[in-house]
Amino acid sequence: MRKAILESYLTEQEEGEHQVLVAENEQACLGYITLVKCPKKGRFSQTGIPEIVDFTVFEHFQGQGIGYRLLDAICQLVSDFTSQIGIGVGLNAHYGKAQKLYVQNGFIPDGTGVWYEDSPLAIEASAYNDDNLSVFYQATGNMISCCIEMLIEKIRSSR
């Protein structure tokens, strides 16, 4: 399943629909981040806001600043053509580090509440707490610049 998703990212990147940035060293892929410039489904599909749709630092490489660098790189890329960027993040404990990362780097909840499978979850509705249960964050204008500056400072201080 994961291989098919990654192959679809490559095809979409070749067609200009997706941007994929990869962090790697001489031996391995450390992580990656993907951006859809014009989402066709989900929260940002009607807004024109580009969306980070997949962001992974493989567990063995976490805690080394790789996630900060990938987020910085995608923020810089986005700032060349828009002043906004969005991301959805899961609500279960598996996503705890990611939730903190986005808030620490200038992303704020977008105020649309909880979503499940690309749709807002109605009040009192039930949902399965899986990877499809999410909340969306957004960085806008100065927040992207602030995000970049904060990331640069964190990278410098981690050396």
Specify the residue positions occupied by each region the protein language model found.
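Active-site rim helix/loop that mediates acceptor-substrate recognition in acyltransferases
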Residues: 1-20, 41
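Conserved beta-strand in the GNAT
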Residues: 22, 28-39, 51-56
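Conserved GNAT acetyl-CoA-binding A-motif
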Residues: 78-91
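Conserved catalytic-core motifs of GNAT/GCN5-like acyltransferases
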Residues: 88-90, 106-126
